[in-house]
């Protein structure tokens, strides 16, 4: 199975931000989308330089947000569309329709120090589809629990 990984560093605009921009001015919404696509295309050029996928793919999105402030659907709804449009614009995918994208799965994590989106593009008709389920089930390693402070002088008399 051919799988490709694309990492988009930073935070993409959410659906609410796009809707707000469109309501203010339709050109502002178009500008927001163009800026997001430009950032994504730069990442594609650096990471997927000569990749051209001409068969259906299954896509796994791993959304790493800096906090839980934005709701999950706001994070991924607009982001998926912009990412897929950038992949088509860069020539990695021929189109983003039903014939080219077999399905997608979203996973969400919090990483305050390194917000990003990891996109896996896996060919859908390749043998060894069990590795696709392994990718979906993958979890980042757990963070080490914080050590509790030893009681200080203030707490000693309690």
Where are these regions (language model features)?
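Catalytic phosphate/metal-binding cores of nucleic-acid and nucleotide-processing enzymes, i.e., regions
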Residues: 1-158
